[in-house]
Amino acid sequence: MRVEAIVEVRMTEDRGKVLKALENVFTPMRIEERQSDMGTILVATCEGHKCLEKLRSAIWRQGIQDAARSVISRGIVGEDTVVFSVNKQAAYVGVVSFVTEAGESPLGPITFTVKTNDVRQFIDWLAPRTYRGRVYYEAPPPD
């Protein structure tokens, strides 16, 4: 599994705070900086499921597996890719709030692109189905 997280650091934002927001939900192996008209773009990448453990833990801690599953499932692109976004400001305080519409996150979201051999297993691992608030199938970590 390969994961890429992209987040914009606007000119009015503190780079350290944006980096903290990213690292509250993601553990990157590498971070590259690219310049844009609006500021700097941070492109964080990693291989394997461990880099998404913080995101998964927050989803489980907040009890939002079903909502997360619904949003993430709508982001399936082709057979091996999932794209979804979380609110940068919420991530800064350790909370996961999914962004479902453009403009919903005024300072821009953190956008994840996950490439995996088994999209369904990835979703079952990150945000499994629940019944009456209890997970009834916990999938093993994806490739």
Swiss-Prot record:
Pfam families: RNA_binding. It comes from the Archaea. InterPro entries: PAB1135-like (IPR002739), Ribosomal_uL5_dom_sf (IPR022803). Belongs to the UPF0201 family. This is UPF0201 protein PAE1632. It comes from Pyrobaculum aerophilum (strain ATCC 51768 / DSM 7523 / JCM 9630 / CIP 104966 / NBRC 100827 / IM2).
